[in-house]
Amino acid sequence: MNKLILLTTLLFLSACAAMQSDDPDSLFFSIPKGSTLSLNKKLDIPHNETHAVIQYGKETTDNKRHDYDVNCRLNLKEFGPRTIEPENFKVTRTEDGQNWISQPSILRYYTEIYLTSDKGTDVIKMVCQEYGDQTDYHFTVEDIEVALGDYFSFTFPEKIDSGK
């Protein structure tokens, strides 16, 4: 009986390990540490806000975003109004997850991309999210890129590190 439990556990763990991918279009791809997130054009931070929201490749607001499609917000420490100039941010880690918005019907799927700036910009992270239900799945990096349009782009390291 113990051998059966051990074998089952090993099979389960090996199946999970195989769910890694180097393909950004895959559900199993995680943005690797050391990647670059480039802001390609000026981004406005609204008055009394510490973030900007991007969806469908355009700047929007929290009230105007469509929660059931992928949307991303760049979180900063200081309040606007102000403009963030184009620059490259380094990815220090990422976290994928989900939490209930209205149990048992609405889930929030999210990816948090923690960032640093060599220019001293007070960036904290980019959070991309989408609402769905239990039958939905987490969005891909390609979905994030579509939501960001030409505002942001990713550059991934040549050798993908399996750590986040």
Residue spans for each PLM region:
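Extracytoplasmic
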Residues: 32-34, 84-88, 108-110, 123
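N-terminal secretory signal peptides
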Residues: 18-85, 93
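Sec-dependent signal peptide recognition
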Residues: 2-7
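C-terminal partner/receptor-binding element of secreted or periplasmic proteins
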Residues: 121-164
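Short, linear, compositionally biased motifs with a strong N-terminal bias
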Residues: 10-11
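Amphipathic beta-strand/beta-sheet edge segments enriched in Tyr/Trp
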Residues: 106-130
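C-terminal motif of bacterial Sec signal peptides marking the signal peptidase cleavage site
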Residues: 14-15
